[in-house]
Swiss-Prot record:
InterPro entries: ADC_synthase, Anth_synth_I-like, Chorismate_C. It comes from Aeropyrum pernix (strain ATCC 700893 / DSM 11879 / JCM 9820 / NBRC 100138 / K1). Feedback inhibited by tryptophan. Binds 1 Mg(2+) ion per subunit. This is Anthranilate synthase component 1.
Length: 438
């Protein structure tokens, strides 16, 4: 496949500065938070994964924004996506979050099953100011060029949390797993990804919690977003979709182990994971599902698995990751590519329609941001991560919600799947400073 062109970082109305000595993304975002800015999107790259860690974005101020229900989420995002944004990074991206339930826009029959969440089906804004950090090129582009940078924050923001004040109990989650196993063994599905929720009471600035999370668990997709009265923080490892120069890709993650306490134990767990027949079979199935999804917007014969079953390590867990790519049909928009892949099979199951039905029946409440998509959208270019290892503020302004899931297949053990959700929530709970007992 042809490589995308080297992106120009110096747009006509922007100023270009060396990255050395320029305020870091988090420093500027913290200053904006302290000053009371209502619209902020900070998308950072970390984790040392060079193929996914070149750019970080900071955007603030609101030129236009939109919030809509799940049924109209894709349609409204298509309307907002800037038609001048055709390559990444772009001068005028739309920053967005689409909920898991936005799938009802393409699968309306699901609307009778899924509930409504406090968060909208889609929320997005086009910023007044954008700063793009090119870590590989050592450059920063400030747009527009006369953008006044916020003064350094002079006060330290406090944060504290307690809880969980509510959670899906171990007994309740293991009962859900047992129910899903009966359905899988009856032939209704091959895999169902079930999640459990935890809620915490919080005080102070969530930006402080984001800083702790980003430091403790650097990932390719770190984000802090203040969208009017809504706030979300996250450290996602998984790319849902990237579209650039007529090429679309997704990076399915399936297969998890906890990190070892020593380098030797870490290697032993990696070998165990890669040789686990259940984990391998689950991963292959979800790679095939990703191939099928990408085929919906790709030229026949162009879809390829360009890397297969690599190991990526994070603070508390390691994962098996693959990469699937295709060449898109002419005039494919970013939102069309997003629709083809959302929600990912890695957070729903296979076959996807029946798995989503079972999820709705067993979880009994809307997921909201969890397993949705967050990122930047243009007309024919964009990039979005799956909302994982994340927490979002509810409408009362003092309750933070988080979810984690596990893929259930025919030989799953309920207690093991519960512990996987505990491990996945580990970094987030440490950042919040709440009880880690599982």
């Amino acid at each position: 496949m042809p490589s995308p062109p080297e992106p120009p970082l110096h747009w006509r109305d922007c100023r270009l500065e060396p990255i050395l000595g320029f305020p870091r993304p988090r420093e500027l975002a913290k200053s904006l938070e302290v000053q009371g800015e209502e619209w902020i999107a900070l998308l950072e790259s970390g984790g040392g994964l060079q193929h996914r860690s070149r750019y970080s974005f900071l955007a603030w101020g609101r030129r236009k924004s939109s919030e809509t229900d799940a049924i109209r989420a894709y349609e409204e995002l298509e309307r907002l996506a800037d038609d001048k944004c055709r390559a990444l990074p772009c001068r005028s991206p739309t920053f967005f979050l689409v909920s898991y339930e936005a799938v009802v826009g393409e699968e309306p029959w699901l609307s009778r099953l899924v509930g409504r969440h406090e968060w909208p089906g889609m929320t997005a804004f086009s910023p007044e100011y954008v700063v793009v950090y090119d870590h590989a090129g050592g450059r920063v582009s400030v747009c527009p060029g006369d953008t006044p940078l916020p003064a350094p924050a002079s006060r330290k923001e406090s944060f504290s949390a307690e809880g969980p004040t509510y959670e899906t109990s171990r007994k309740g989650f293991e009962a859900m797993v047992a129910d899903a196993l009966e359905r899988i063994r009856a032939g209704e599905a091959f895999q169902v990804v079930l999640s459990r929720v935890e809620r915490y009471r919080v005080w102070g600035s969530l930006f402080s919690a984001y800083e702790r999370l980003a430091d403790a668990n650097p990932s390719p997709y770190l984000y802090y977003a203040r969208l009017g009265g809504r706030v979300i923080i996250g450290s996602s490892p998984e790319l849902l979709v990237k579209l650039e120069a007529g090429r679309v890709e997704t990076h399915p993650i399936a297969g998890t182990r906890p990190r070892g306490s020593t380098p030797i134990e870490d290697i032993e767990l990696e070998v165990e994971l890669l040789n686990d027949e259940k984990e391998r079979a689950e991963h292959v199935m979800l790679v095939d599902l990703a191939r099928n999804d990408i085929t919906r917007v790709s030229i026949p014969g162009t879809v390829q698995v360009t890397s297969f079953m690599d190991i990526e390590r994070y603070e508390t867990v390691m994962h098996i990751v693959s990469r699937v790519e295709g060449v898109t049909r002419p005039s494919t928009t970013f939102v069309e590519a997003l629709k083809a892949l959302h929600p990912a099979g890695t957070v729903s199951g296979a076959p996807k329609p029946r798995a989503m039905e079972i999820i709705a029946e067993l979880e009994e409440e809307a997921r909201g941001p969890y397993a949705g998509a967050i990122g930047v959208a243009g007309s024919s270019a964009g990039e979005a991560a799956i909302v994982l290892r994340s927490a979002w503020l509810l409408d009362d302004g003092e309750t933070l919600e988080a979810r984690a899931g596990a893929g259930i297949v025919y030989d799953s053990k309920p207690e093991r799947e519960y512990m996987e959700t505990v491990q996945k929530l580990g970094s987030l709970k440490r950042a919040l400073g709440v009880d880690m007992c599982g």
